[in-house]
Amino acid sequence: MTLVMGPAALQAQTDVAASLYGSFRGTSNGNGTAESPSNPAGVMLEMRHISNPLVGYELNYSFNRSDEEYKGSVSTPQICTPNCVPAGNTVYQAVKANAHRVGADWFVSLSHLPVKPFALAGVGLLFISPDGGQSDVRGNTKPVFEYGAGVDWTVIPHLGLRFQYRGDLYHSPDLAKAFSSTNRFANTAKPMIGAYFRF
């Protein structure tokens, strides 16, 4: 048994990483509402463990602003004043918010190469919290499917750079109470660059 387990044990690796990213998502339209997000920068923290030459798991946390703009016909106009602004035949409302996301992924990596390509997929939860001082808004909690790919580049032993692209798939946020939900799926693209330390 020792002879069988020994090579696998030698491949076990754990690393921690921090990355900066841009968050890009298009406008969602549905049920008479157009929901337009900002495209903010964010930060992600990761912990990865790989226990054999190919497969491992990851836990991650990310934060970015999640300001939203809503435009359309309101279902209850009386609660839209003074938060909504007339825009032609429709009304407009901006909501300022923070987004926190936690996730868990499986990933496949060619960990024995100097430049290590990887691919990942997993699930998480997205918590969107409007800033204080705004009325007629609500927080959202959304389940998320995450996918991505990238490369780790070893600079010196135990330290390297991580270049990756990630996507988050989830239902579009509905933070403004006066507007109907678009009831659409949103896909957020996140190109990232970061650094890792491998134990």
Language model feature labels by segment:
Residues 16-26, 30, 123-127, 168:
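Transmembrane beta-strand segments that form the barrel wall of outer-membrane beta-barrel proteins
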Residues 11-13, 146, 164:
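Glutamine-centric residue-chemistry signal
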Residues 15-19, 56-58, 118-120, 160-162:
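Residue-level detector of the transmembrane beta-barrel scaffold of outer-membrane proteins
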Residues 36-39, 142, 152-176, 180-188:
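Subset of outer-membrane beta-barrel
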Residues 46-133, 142-143, 153, 188-199:
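Gram-negative (and chloroplast) outer-membrane scaffold detector with strong preference
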Residues 1-14:
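Cleavable N-terminal export/targeting peptides
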Residues 23-44, 140-142:
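Surface-exposed strand-loop-strand hairpins of Gram-negative outer-membrane beta-barrel proteins
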Residues 28-34, 69-76, 129-137, 173-180:
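Outer-membrane beta-barrel translocator domains and adjoining extracellular loop/strand segments
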